[in-house]
Amino acid sequence: MFDLVIKNSRLVGKSGEYNIGVKDKKIREITKKSIKSENIIDIKSNYLMPGFIDPHVHFRDPGLTRKEDFRTGSEAAAHGGFATVIDMPNTLPKTNTYDALKEKMNLASKKSVVNFYLQAGHNSLDEMTRMMELNPVSFKVFMDLETDESLEEIFKNLGKLKDSTSYNGLVAAHCEKRSIVSEKTQELEESNDPIDYSYARPHISEDESVKQTIELARKNNLRLHICHLSSKNALNIARKNNISYEFTPHHLLLDNSAYNTYGTMVKTNPPLRPKDVCVKISDIDENSIIGTDHAPHTLEEKQKGVFTSSPGIPALETVASLLLTEVNKGNLSLELIPKILSKNAARVFELESKGEIAVGKDADFTVIDLKRKGKFDISTFKTKAEYSPFDGWEYEGAPVMTIVNGSVVFDDL
């Protein structure tokens, strides 16, 4: 007898309908035959996908919980079809000490309704060695906050950490060149035109930073994952060097003309790019990863000046439907959805029990109604953020149920 049976499931790439048997939070059977359980969910011929994984969220907890916390952030994740998230280390305090990492693990364990993993911030070699006792999935480096000299030291220490501990050598990098951003920002920081923010952090700063980061990673025998790629040239550099990367929905669907419509509501780092250099839906391939960079702020923080307002866009509750709409438009293959929203992130971040619907994997699932139509309404979102450039956009296709470790955490079936 199974703890849970999910019946009448369509699986991407397979014909017919399947029944999935779950026991002890694991997938134990995948069959077209009838199987028994006292707990049966009939998903009515909708698509069953491996639970979505977002490798890039900012849940602001601890220290910045006016913007978001692990409860509201994880509820937003579940609402958006995500069973697993990876949280970033730029909280208060920064998650770059053993004590801070331990504190965040404890509070997330109490608040989160989805699976969570944590990235750690860099520190001294001794402190990072202590942090490895808590198994962060990777270390995050904000290239735009560091000088070239400090970056050399940071990557050297990460290389030493890999040689002396269980650290797998994965570095997640925010790639913008500090010197270029500083120079261009000084030229434009008096501007009141939001579009100038994109020129203050030009695509060349990302392109050059990606090159530098690849060199530093290779020099120190580290694996590299590039966050929120926004420049087409930077994407080509990453692909040429076989480097993993992620796209955000806003960089794929908006260019910098959106600043004329939404103002600082679409301010983000890296910024939205001019149409001739930005990444697009057509750039998604079977190795791509979607990372939302879900980065909520208060309205007050978003409504300040062009250069004083806070950068960041909430995205967990819109991304799946935005991509499924592109599927329905014929701009994106349905077969790519479980790869870019689950399988590829599980591979890169070594979440070995996740990312696929297969016997022995964790019972994390996202149910997709490919024909569900609606209009985004920020007032119905779980996030604390009260803004989104996609508020009011119509969509076709939506996550209608999220299951985490065999338990339903969101149900709109």
PLM segments and residue spans:
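N-terminal metal-binding scaffold of metallo-dependent hydrolase/deaminase domains
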Residues: 1-35
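Divalent metal-coordination and catalytic microenvironments
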Residues: 9, 25, 45, 56, ...
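Active-site metal-binding motif and surrounding structural segment of the metallo-beta-lactamase
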Residues: 33-49
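Metal-associated gating/positioning segment near the N- to mid-region
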Residues: 46-111
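Divalent metal-binding segments
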Residues: 58-67, 86-98, 118-126, 142-149, ...
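Histidine/acidic residue-rich metal-binding segments in metalloenzymes
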Residues: 126-290
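His/Asp/Glu-enriched, well-ordered alpha-helical/loop segment
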Residues: 194-221, 287-289, 295-368
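C-terminal cap of metal-dependent C-N hydrolases
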Residues: 359-413
